[in-house]
């Protein structure tokens, strides 16, 4: 990860290309651009309602394929190529259980082509207004997809509308997932966090190449949703990513979401599983790595279903310390940020994947039993949770609604607000939002009680209603929803351009200062103040104080103790 991505034999050739060859506009076969590794040729598309064509470059390599001896290592430089490289086909997905994507298409009312799946997946897609060329210096937005770090793809997100309407460059990045992105031996032989290091490599590629597509390497905004937002939040805290971006947007995810690290007993159990798989001693890290690098990728994908501890780790490189400690110590660069949540984060999508039975209703006893198992709160203190969330709720549907609100609070809202406060207190400009609109397209697929569910804002941010290619992100949008999408694209792009989302013809979005005002994103915009303040106080003051007086733990508890108590919920409400 030295950052030296230029093959020595390419330096002179590349310099000649820059001086001698035109890079402007599409050729008869498609737009061509040079990179430091060789020439690529993309395609040109248009979107609904905009006269601006967009140059699209798909499957651009930012690192070498992580195969064989490169499995479970830091991403390495991609090799240069001599001939014009075709960049009009979607890259393979990183290895994953692709059945989830089929389920998501139905649940999220989206459609996209069938993609291949491979370990050879470290590619990015670029969307640029056709007029953009070297010297244009347009703002760059780099998107990291979500999917619980287990599923996801760059190609299900089409940046064409955002690029056309807002005159920005959009880059969508793939990174290793699951065991391929996070396997670790918890020592120097395989320190882990490969997925995050892939993201650093992609940002390094952007710094070195995006100017040839018309982007400004000194104005890069990273953004993402769910696991992608967790990635953005993590990159802010990592010294490895220092200087590679300048602004950040976190949609429904931050680095202190609690499920992201494993218990010690889970680590030990999982190493035993891997050792048994390889026929090695679990203490021999080098032997385990040699074995795993020779195994077929599908066998490793199957193996990963038997493990749950291969997640984020404090490796001393990407994460020099726990994210919460880095935040509290202000050990990060204070850059402008947008942080936000939806008003029903665990309303349907997440529980539907893992525990659909609770959506039909829940009695108080069942709800409290589930909460006890999730939060590890001693039974004698469950009455506090009951009083906070269920004291005036009696029907099965009322209790269900409160349970879903509780889960959304614990896993999304409270961590997001805590993170916003840390960023604010470090001197960074912060803008907070709550997305509140339920898309009309879900009228026949989601129950009426569901409001703005997890991931619902994404189709608005990307202008899904204006796409007309083979990626369908927003069918059946109403005219009001199209207007909301235009406003949200404008907010995001204005922020990418200036570090402040406010602009002409947009409702005022105040900074998140000590008054804690925030923008309620809806068909009719409005301002709110101190979002869910009683619930934040409950989880950061009342519960930790009670638990610190109990015998369940042997060390003092901080006001954020609840963040470390929720890991068993990983497979229930993973973003």
Curated annotation (Swiss-Prot):
GO cellular component: extracellular region
Catalytic activity, EC: 3.1.1.1
CDD domains, per the entry: Esterase_lipase (cd00312)
Organism: Homo sapiens (Human)
Protein family: Belongs to the type-B carboxylesterase/lipase family.
Catalytic activity: a carboxylic ester + H2O = an alcohol + a carboxylate + H(+)
Gene3D superfamilies: alpha/beta hydrolase
Disulfide bonds: 94-121
Pfam families linked: COesterase (PF00135)
UniProt entry tagged with the keyword Glycoprotein: yes
Protein name per its UniProtKB record: Carboxylesterase 5A
Subcellular location: Secreted
The protein's role, per its UniProt record: Involved in the detoxification of xenobiotics and in the activation of ester and amide prodrugs.
Active site: 226, 345, 454
GO MF annotations, alphabetized: carboxylesterase activity
Signal peptide bounds: 1-20
Keywords: Disulfide bond, Glycoprotein, Hydrolase, Secreted, Serine esterase, Signal
UniProt PTM comment: N-glycosylated.
Positions annotated with a glycan in the UniProt record: 281, 363, 513, 524
4Fe-4S keyword on record: no
């Amino acid at each position: 990860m030295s950052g030296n991505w230029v093959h020595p034999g390419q330096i002179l050739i590349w310099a000649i290309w820059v001086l001698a060859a035109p890079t402007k506009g599409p050729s008869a076969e498609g737009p061509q651009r040079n990179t430091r590794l060789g020439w690529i040729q993309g395609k040109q598309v248009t979107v609904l309602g905009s006269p601006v064509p967009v140059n699209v470059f798909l499957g651009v390599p930012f690192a070498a394929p992580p195969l064989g001896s490169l499995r479970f290592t830091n991403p390495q430089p991609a090799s240069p190529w001599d001939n014009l490289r075709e960049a009009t086909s979607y890259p393979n997905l990183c290895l994953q259980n692709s059945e989830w994507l089929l389920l998501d298409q139905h649940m999220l009312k989206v459609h996209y082509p069938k993609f291949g799946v491979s370990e050879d997946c470290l590619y990015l897609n670029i969307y640029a207004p056709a007029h953009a060329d070297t010297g244009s210096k347009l703002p760059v937005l780099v998107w990291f997809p979500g999917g619980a770090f287990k599923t996801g793809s760059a190609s299900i997100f089409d940046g064409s509308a955002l690029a056309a309407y807002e005159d920005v460059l959009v880059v969508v990045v793939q990174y290793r997932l699951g065991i391929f992105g996070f396997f670790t031996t918890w020592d120097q032989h395989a320190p882990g966090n490969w997925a995050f290091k892939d993201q650093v490599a992609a940002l390094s590629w952007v710094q070195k190449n995006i100017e040839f597509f018309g982007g400004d390497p000194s104005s890069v905004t990273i953004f993402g949703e769910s696991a992608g937002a967790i990635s953005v939040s993590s990159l802010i805290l990592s010294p490895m990513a220092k200087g590679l971006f300048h602004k950040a947007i976190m949609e429904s995810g931050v680095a202190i979401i609690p499920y992201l690290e494993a218990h010690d007993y889970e680590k030990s159990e999982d190493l035993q599983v891997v050792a048994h798989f390889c026929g090695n001693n679990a203490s021999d890290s080098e032997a385990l790595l040699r074995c795993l690098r020779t195994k077929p990728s599908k066998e490793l994908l199957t193996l990963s279903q038997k493990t749950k501890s291969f997640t984020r780790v404090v490796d001393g490189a990407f994460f020099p310390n726990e994210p919460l400690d880095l935040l509290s110590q202000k050990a990060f660069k204070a850059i402008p940020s947008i942080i936000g949540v939806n008003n029903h984060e665990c309303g349907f999508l997440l529980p539907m994947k893992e525990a659909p039975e609770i959506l039909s209703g829940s009695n108080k006893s069942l709800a409290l039993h589930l909460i006890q198992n999730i939060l590890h709160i001693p039974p004698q203190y469950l009455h506090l949770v009951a009083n906070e969330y269920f004291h005036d709720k009696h029907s099965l549907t009322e209790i269900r609604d409160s349970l879903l609100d509780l889960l959304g609070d614990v896993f999304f809202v409270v961590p997001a607000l805590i993170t916003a406060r840390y960023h604010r207190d470090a001197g960074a400009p912060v803008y907070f939002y709550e997305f509140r609109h339920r898309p009309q397209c879900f009228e026949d697929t989601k129950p009426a009680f569901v409001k703005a569910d997890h991931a619902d804002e994404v189709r608005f941010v990307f202008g899904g209603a204006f796409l007309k290619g083979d990626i369908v992100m927003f069918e059946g949008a109403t005219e009001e929803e199209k207007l909301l999408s235009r406003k949200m694209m404008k907010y995001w792009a204005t922020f990418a351009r200036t570090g402040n989302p406010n602009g002409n013809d947009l409702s005022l979005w105040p900074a998140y200062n000590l008054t804690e005002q925030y923008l309620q994103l809806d068909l009719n915009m409005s301002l709110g103040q101190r979002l869910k303040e009683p619930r934040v106080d409950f989880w950061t003051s009342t519960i930790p104080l009670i638990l610190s007086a109990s015998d369940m733990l042997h060390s003092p508890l901080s006001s954020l103790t609840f963040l470390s108590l929720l890991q068993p919920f990983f497979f229930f409400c993973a973003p």
